[in-house]
Amino acid sequence: MSTVVEKSGEAKPGKVEVGVKLRGAEKVARIPVKIIPTEELPKKPDWIRVRIPVSPEVDRIKQLLRKHKLHSVCEEASCPNLGECFSGGTATFMIMGDICTRRCPFCDVGHGRPKPLDVDEPTNLAIAIADLRLKYVVITSVDRDDLRDGGAQHFADCLREIRKLSPGIQLETLVPDYRGRMDIALEITANEPPDVFNHNLETVPRLYRSSRPGSDFEWSLDLLQKFKQMVPHVPTKSGLMLGLGETDEEVIEVMQRMREHDIDMLTLGQYLQPSRNHLPVQRFVHPDTFAWFAEEGERMGFKNVASGPLVRSSYHADQQAHGNKIG
């Protein structure tokens, strides 16, 4: 198993050119803790079974994404549900490029200095969604700390263009934390709100330094609460990955904090290490434990809890938004 240790006395990596995507060891070399690579990835338990993403529908959606120069988080983040979702004719779109300004060592999305925004992306995204005849779409993004509003206006532009071509569609946004730009970002978002506002806490506060460098647990909670105060009729949603070293007690505490901040929906899923250079899996949470978390969440008052090993933030998001049980 790989380990995480504090760095001391190491030379800082050089500046990255615009448009160069760093992944794996190059990416995690730029965080405040050192990831010692795993010698061998842990064997997954029997309850984690993933469909191989091979079907005509998978190929069709990938070709459509390339045609319109779009990205799906399903591919970029190596989501284990890619085959199931693509085969069902759905996808979670990732806007603002495929290079993130953050360096989270659990995530497989590339890091670097992103290119300027593609002004045609809102239109191209709307056309692609109309071509696919989708009824529920999740839109997420890389972090864009280089933008004065964190990319909030680009999100709003995308929602507006999609609604023009697909009247009646439901849109969920999975947004970054808008670090240092919360007020302007939320003002923009409130003027063109999604149907579900999602921002993931990802893990428990104790693990933020090693798991989410550059992010702040309390800031993320405040983002969700302030949006809810501004647009009270729109459901808010957040999620955690389990298996990074948290305890069950810490998970329950975070769930309670979420409810204190008026978060309506919750997702809980198993962290799966993308490569030997990413954060190690500390435990595989049993399905019975996920079921227990779901029961506790419902008791706390969440409107919907999706809790299971392969649950991800946008996994069957349409069903969760409609109140169906996911897990």
UniProtKB/Swiss-Prot annotation:
Question: Where is the secretion signal located?
Answer: none
Catalytic activity reads: [[Fe-S] cluster scaffold protein carrying a second [4Fe-4S](2+) cluster] + N(6)-octanoyl-L-lysyl-[protein] + 2 oxidized [2Fe-2S]-[ferredoxin] + 2 S-adenosyl-L-methionine + 4 H(+) = [[Fe-S] cluster scaffold protein] + N(6)-[(R)-dihydrolipoyl]-L-lysyl-[protein] + 4 Fe(3+) + 2 hydrogen sulfide + 2 5'-deoxyadenosine + 2 L-methionine + 2 reduced [2Fe-2S]-[ferredoxin]
Q: Which GO terms describe its cellular component?
A: cytoplasm
Q: Which gene encodes it?
A: lipA
Pathway listed for it is: Protein modification; protein lipoylation via endogenous pathway; protein N(6)-(lipoyl)lysine from octanoyl-[acyl-carrier-protein]: step 2/2
InterPro entries to which the protein is assigned, alphabetical: Aldolase_TIM, Elp3/MiaA/NifB-like_rSAM, LIAS_N, Lipoyl_synth, rSAM
Q: Which Pfam families match?
A: LIAS_N, Radical_SAM
The UniProt record lists the keyword Metal-binding: yes
Which residues hold [4Fe-4S] cluster 2? 100, 104, 107
Note the HAMAP family from the entry: Lipoyl_synth
Name this polypeptide is given: Lipoyl synthase
User: Which compartment or compartments is the protein found in?
Assistant: Cytoplasm
Q: What is the lineage of its organism?
A: Bacteria, Pseudomonadati, Pseudomonadota, Gammaproteobacteria, Pseudomonadales
Keywords, A to Z, come to: 4Fe-4S, Cytoplasm, Iron, Iron-sulfur, Metal-binding, S-adenosyl-L-methionine, Transferase
